[in-house]
Regions:
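A residue-level marker of the well-folded mature domains of exported/periplasmic proteins
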Residues: 20-364
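Sec-dependent N-terminal signal peptides
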Residues: 4-13, 17
Length: 364
């Protein structure tokens, strides 16, 4: 046994002598998106800081035509290649098969039905519907107009799961509380068209929604929320948080946006109610760790949700004082039910149509 342990330690030391060069290829949003590109890069930086002998580089994709040259460049010059975003799925699969001696990690990338995943490719996706469910329940609990909004970029699976989950949360609230909160939905057709995103957000607010969950450029929806909200409160755009909170309680209502994929509450304190949290940083770190230490790469499709803390919502650092304690307690209770497998969140329209939570008894 001692000889085996010595051999294992020697192997790890041998591997660490050479380390790994990790090259991340962004989606078209690039760094600074305050979303999954930034989150994945944070996971890479965490690996650089916490794991031995990791060198990191990043290649920025400005548009989808950059995927092939960037991923090819990364495969030729790196030991581990991380591709970010659903839109580069086909390219990542093709490049991974061309470079079998390189490890590939796909973040927010899932295989097609019956698609064989190469042994050098690890895919990480998330149960966005679970985070969306909690956000929908919170929005329905907080709305003063009985209307909430959802804005997506492109109708791709991760965004649709967010939408379905969000609407499921609203439906759960309606069934449990006997209310009739409705959801206004809209899609931009792009993840980068800030002007159209803001236009849709203003339209949602104009049609009565007072809370919007955005699965697209959050900054544009925040601009809309601040524009409408500051006018309603009679405050300047740069009003401090304490004044926003005072006016919220004075007026008895306000205008909010819900961020996505990362904790975006800090971007506009008092206007960002909360954010979904997709642990893309953890996925990137675990993929790199697997390549470094195991050399038995943990390939395949890994789906992370609330049960394994891959999804969640932000702690509402700036707005928790606006949210009744009863609502906070209900969110914690519902999250526990999901962790325990006692409630399954719909992933598509058919499942949403038959969604029934009347059996859920909130014990307070």
């Amino acid at each position: 046994m001692r000889k085996v342990l010595v051999l294992m330690m020697a192997l790890i030391m041998f591997v660490n002598m050479f380390g790994l060069k990790v090259i991340m290829v962004t989606d078209a949003g690039g760094l600074g998106d305050k979303s999954f590109n930034d989150g994945t890069w944070a996971g890479v930086q965490m690996a650089v800081e916490q794991l031995p002998d990791i060198e990191a580089e990043i290649l920025i994709s400005k548009e989808q035509t950059d995927y092939v040259p960037n991923l090819t460049n990364a495969a030729q010059n790196g030991d581990v290649v991380i591709g970010v975003g659903f839109m580069m799925a086909d390219v990542l699969f093709n490049i991974a098969m061309q470079y079998p001696d390189t490890f590939f990690i796909g973040i927010d990338i899932e295989p097609s039905p019956n698609q064989v995943i190469p042994s050098n490719l690890a895919l990480y996706t998330f149960k966005e519907e679970e985070g969306g469910f909690l956000l929908g329940y919170l929005a329905a609990s907080m709305t003063k107009t009985n209307k909430v909004g959802f804005i997506g970029g492109l109708e791709i699976p991760p965004v649709k799961r967010y939408e379905i989950g969000y609407r499921s949360g609203v439906e759960a609230f309606n069934q449990i509380k006997g209310e009739n909160v409705t959801v206004i939905t809209g899609y931009v057709g792009s993840f980068t068209d800030s002007s159209k995103t803001k236009q849709i957000a203003l339209s949602h607010y104009d049609h009565g929604a007072d809370i919007i969950f955005t699965g697209v450029t959050t900054a544009a929806v925040i601009d809309a929320a601040k524009e409408v909200g500051s006018s309603f409160y009679g405050l300047p755009d740069n009003a401090p948080l304490n004044q926003i909170i005072e006016e919220y309680f004075e007026k008895g209502r306000g205008y909010f946006v819900i961020g996505y994929d990362m904790d975006q509450d800090y971007i506009a304190p008092g206007y960002v109610l909360t954010s979904s949290r997709k642990k893309v940083d953890v996925a990137a770190f675990e993929g790199i760790r697997s390549a470094l230490y195991d050399r038995n790469f943990n390939s395949g499709h890994h789906v992370l949700g609330i049960e394994d803390e891959g999804m969640g919502i932000s702690p509402m650092k700036y707005t928790k004082g606006m949210v009744p304690n009863e609502v906070i307690a209900e969110l914690v209770f519902l999250q526990k039910l999901m962790k325990d497998g006692e409630v399954d969140i719909p992933q598509n329209e058919a499942e949403l149509g038959s969604f029934d939570v009347n059996s859920i008894n909130i014990p307070f």
